[in-house]
C-alpha cells in the first residue's frame, strides 16, 4: 500500500516513481481514494520535474488498465486492427475519409474519438450532424460493426480509461494541461485501450495546433512515439502543418459534406489529400497491408477510384443508425444554415498568412463549437470555400463563405475572418504540409 502523499513527495523531490507506485496512484484516481487536490499536486510535480520514459510508459499503461481494454481475438478478423489519432486543429476531417479508406484496403479501424473543445473541431460533433448517427453503440454492437464493415467511429464510454477522465478534468483547472508527459499518457491511455496492432499519430504544428511551435510539437511527437512503442504498440508519428485550415471548410455539417465529396471524387483539397494519403499509407505499412509506399498508395487510390472507400463510409453510417442513402441524398439530410454569404478582404492582394486558431474560434462564435463541455452546437454553421496562403483576393474572390444563424452572427464572423487572414502584395514562401516522420 502506497500513500498518495508519499508518491507526491517523491516526485516533488525529483525522484523516479516505480511502476507499482504509479499504478497505485492511478487506481486511487479511479476509485476516488485519491483526492482532487492530490491529483493536482502530482500533476504539478510532474509539470515541474518531468518523468522518465519508463515512468511515462507505466503511467500510460495504468491509465489504459483503469478500465476495460478491447480484445479482438475472438472475432477472427482477417486483417490488422489499426487506428489514427490527431492532436487536432481546424478543418481536420481526415478521420472521416481515412477510416473507410483503410477498411476498404482490408484493415479494421475501431476509432474512439472525441468532441471539439476550444478552437478545434471534434469528429463526434461532425458525425452527429448526420441524422440518427449513433456514437454510443453497445460494446457488442461496436464489435459487430467492426467485424462487418471494418470501420466504426464512436465516443469514449465510461468503461474506457476512466482514470484519465478524472485526471484530465483536474489538469484542466490547475494549469497542467500543457504537460507533455501527461498529454501523451492521456492520448495513449485511451488509444491503447482499443487493442490495436498499430497506431499512426498526426501531431499538428502551427497557429491552429495544440503546440504552436515546431519545437514543442516535436517534443510531443517524440514523447508519444517513445511511450506508445514502449507500451508495445507499433507506432509511427507524422508532424503536419496547421498554419491554415486543413480542409476548404470548417464546421460540422460542412466538413461532413467535404468528406463525402472527397470520397466520391467530386472535390479533393490538395493539402487534405496529401495528409490523408500519408496517414493512410502509414496505417497500411504498419499493419502489414502493404510492403512499400508505392504499393500502399496504389491500393488507396484504387479504393477511391472504384468507390470502395465511399461504400465503406456509407455502410458505417447505416450500421450506426444513420440514413442508408446518406451519400446519395446528402442535401436532404444535412442541416442547412439560415444564411450563407461571402466575406471579402478589406484590400485586394495575396493571402500571406492565416491565424488558424482565430478562424476556429470564429466557427465557435457562430455556434459551431463549444466554449464549455456543456454547450450545445449548431451543426449547420461554419466557413466554406476558404482561401489559402498564396491565393489572390479582391472584390471577386472572397476570403470565405460564412454560414450563420443570423445576420448579427454573420457580421461578427466576417470581422473575425478579415482579421484572421492577412493580405499582402507578395507571394508567401511555400511551406511543407508534412514536416517530419518519426518511425522505428
UniProtKB/Swiss-Prot annotation:
One of its GO terms (molecular function) is 1,4-alpha-oligoglucan phosphorylase activity. The keyword Magnesium does not apply. Keywords: Glycosyltransferase, Transferase. SUPFAM superfamilies: Nucleoside phosphorylase/phosphoribosyltransferase catalytic domain, Nucleoside phosphorylase/phosphoribosyltransferase N-terminal domain, Pyrimidine nucleoside phosphorylase C-terminal domain. SMART domains: PYNP_C (SM00941). It is an enzyme of class 2 (transferase). One of its GO terms (biological process) is thymidine metabolic process. InterPro entries: Glycosyl_Trfase_fam3, Glycosyl_Trfase_fam3_N_dom, Glycosyl_Trfase_fam3_N_dom_sf, Nuc_phospho_transferase, PYNP-like_C_sf, PYNP_C, Pyrmidine_PPas_bac/euk, Pyrmidine_PPase_CS. Pathway: Pyrimidine metabolism; dTMP biosynthesis via salvage pathway; dTMP from thymine: step 1/2. It comes from the Bacteria. It catalyses: thymidine + phosphate = 2-deoxy-alpha-D-ribose 1-phosphate + thymine. Gene3D superfamilies: Nucleoside phosphorylase/phosphoribosyltransferase catalytic domain, Pyrimidine nucleoside phosphorylase-like, C-terminal domain, Transferase, Pyrimidine Nucleoside Phosphorylase, Chain C. GO terms for cellular component: cytosol. Its EC number is 2.4.2.4. The enzymes which catalyze the reversible phosphorolysis of pyrimidine nucleosides are involved in the degradation of these compounds and in their utilization as carbon and energy sources, or in the rescue of pyrimidine bases for nucleotide synthesis. Belongs to the thymidine/pyrimidine-nucleoside phosphorylase family. Homodimer. This is Thymidine phosphorylase.
Amino acid at each position: 500500500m502506497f500513500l498518495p502523499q508519499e508518491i507526491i513527495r517523491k516526485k516533488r523531490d525529483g525522484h523516479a516513481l516505480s511502476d507499482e507506485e504509479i499504478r497505485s496512484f492511478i487506481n486511487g484516481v479511479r476509485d476516488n481514494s485519491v483526492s482532487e487536490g492530490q491529483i493536482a499536486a502530482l500533476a504539478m510535480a510532474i509539470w515541474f520535474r518531468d518523468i522518465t520514459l519508463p515512468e511515462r510508459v507505466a503511467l500510460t499503461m495504468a491509465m489504459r488498465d483503469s478500465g476495460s481494454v478491447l480484445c479482438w481475438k475472438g472475432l477472427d478478423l482477417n486483417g490488422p486492427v489499426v487506428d489514427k489519432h490527431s492532436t487536432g486543429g481546424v478543418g481536420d476531417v481526415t478521420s472521416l475519409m481515412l477510416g473507410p479508406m483503410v477498411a476498404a484496403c482490408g484493415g479494421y479501424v475501431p476509432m474512439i474519438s472525441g468532441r471539439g473543445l476550444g478552437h478545434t473541431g471534434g469528429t463526434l460533433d461532425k458525425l452527429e450532424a448526420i441524422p440518427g448517427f449513433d456514437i454510443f453503440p453497445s460494446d457488442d454492437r461496436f464489435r459487430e460493426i467492426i467485424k462487418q464493415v471494418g470501420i466504426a467511429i464512436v465516443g469514449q464510454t465510461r468503461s474506457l480509461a476512466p482514470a484519465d477522465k478524472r485526471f484530465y478534468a483536474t489538469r484542466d483547472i490547475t494549469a497542467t494541461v500543457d504537460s507533455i508527459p501527461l498529454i501523451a499518457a492521456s492520448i495513449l491511455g485511451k488509444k491503447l485501450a482499443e487493442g490495436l496492432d498499430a497506431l499512426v499519430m498526426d501531431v499538428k504544428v502551427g497557429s491552429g495546433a495544440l503546440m504552436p511551435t515546431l519545437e514543442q510539437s516535436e517534443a510531443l511527437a517524440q514523447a508519444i512515439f517513445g511511450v506508445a512503442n514502449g507500451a508495445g504498440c507499433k507506432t509511427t508519428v507524422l508532424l503536419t502543418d496547421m498554419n491554415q485550415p486543413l480542409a476548404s471548410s470548417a464546421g460540422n455539417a460542412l466538413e461532413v459534406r467535404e468528406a463525402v465529396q472527397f470520397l466520391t471524387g467530386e472535390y479533393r483539397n490538395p493539402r487534405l489529400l496529401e495528409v490523408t494519403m500519408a496517414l493512410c499509407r502509414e496505417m497500411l505499412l504498419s499493419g502489414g497491408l502493404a510492403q512499400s509506399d508505392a504499393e500502399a498508395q496504389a491500393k488507396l487510390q484504387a479504393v477511391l477510384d472504384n468507390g470502395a472507400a465511399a461504400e465503406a463510409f456509407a455502410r458505417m453510417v447505416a450500421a450506426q443508425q444513420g440514413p442508408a442513402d446518406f451519400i446519395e441524398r446528402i442535401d436532404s439530410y444535412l442541416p442547412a444554415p439560415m444564411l450563407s454569404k461571402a466575406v471579402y478582404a478589406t484590400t485586394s492582394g495575396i493571402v500571406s498568412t492565416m491565424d488558424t486558431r482565430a478562424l476556429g474560434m470564429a466557427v465557435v462564435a457562430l455556434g459551431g463549437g463549444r466554449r464549455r463541455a456543456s454547450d450545445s452546437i449548431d451543426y449547420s454553421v461554419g466557413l466554406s470555400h476558404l482561401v489559402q496562403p498564396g491565393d489572390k483576393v479582391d472584390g471577386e474572390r472572397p476570403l470565405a463563405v460564412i454560414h450563420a444563424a443570423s445576420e448579427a452572427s454573420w457580421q461578427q464572423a466576417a470581422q473575425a475572418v478579415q482579421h484572421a487572414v492577412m493580405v499582402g502584395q507578395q507571394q508567401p514562401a511555400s511551406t511543407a504540409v508534412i514536416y517530419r516522420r518519426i518511425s522505428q
